[in-house]
Amino acid sequence: MALFGGSSSQAPASATDNKVQAFKQQIAQEIAVANATDLVNKVSENCFEKCLQSPYKDGNEGCVDQCLAKYMRSWNVISKTYINRIQDASTTGEI
């Protein structure tokens, strides 16, 4: 019971903040997994559709390797930019 007979149902601010941060981290991890899954699906669709032809040719493997490398370079640039924007927004209090 709190002062004057009322009940105190509020959690301490630090405990609430910890829960919020944990929830944000969980969401960020789920988004990262979803993005990685999306990347794998797009790479599979685009690179293999573009490069693997019937009948199989010796150049097909090199085409797939180059396509995968391009996707990964692009993914890295986009991810770094996204992370920087999120960090900037976090420090300015936008999120």
From Swiss-Prot:
A motif (Twin CX3C motif) lies at residues 47-67. Belongs to the small Tim family. Mitochondrial intermembrane chaperone that participates in the import and insertion of some multi-pass transmembrane proteins into the mitochondrial inner membrane. Also required for the transfer of beta-barrel precursors from the TOM complex to the sorting and assembly machinery (SAM complex) of the outer membrane. Acts as a chaperone-like protein that protects the hydrophobic precursors from aggregation and guide them through the mitochondrial intermembrane space. Keywords: Chaperone, Disulfide bond, Membrane, Metal-binding, Mitochondrion, Mitochondrion inner membrane, Protein transport, Translocation, Transport, Zinc. GO terms for biological process: protein insertion into mitochondrial inner membrane. InterPro entries: Tim10-like, Tim10-like_dom_sf. Heterohexamer; composed of 3 copies of TIM8 and 3 copies of TIM13, named soluble 70 kDa complex. Associates with the TIM22 complex, whose core is composed of TIM22 and TIM54. Interacts with the transmembrane regions of multi-pass transmembrane proteins in transit. One of its GO terms (cellular component) is mitochondrial inner membrane. The twin CX3C motif contains 4 conserved Cys residues that form 2 disulfide bonds in the mitochondrial intermembrane space. However, during the transit of TIM13 from cytoplasm into mitochondrion, the Cys residues probably coordinate zinc, thereby preventing folding and allowing its transfer across mitochondrial outer membrane. Disulfide bonds join 47-67, 51-63. The gene is TIM13. It comes from the Eukaryota. SUPFAM superfamilies: Tim10-like. Its main location: mitochondrion. It is a peripheral membrane protein. GO terms for molecular function: metal ion binding; protein transporter activity. Pfam families: zf-Tim10_DDP. This is Mitochondrial import inner membrane translocase subunit TIM13. It is found in: Mitochondrion inner membrane.
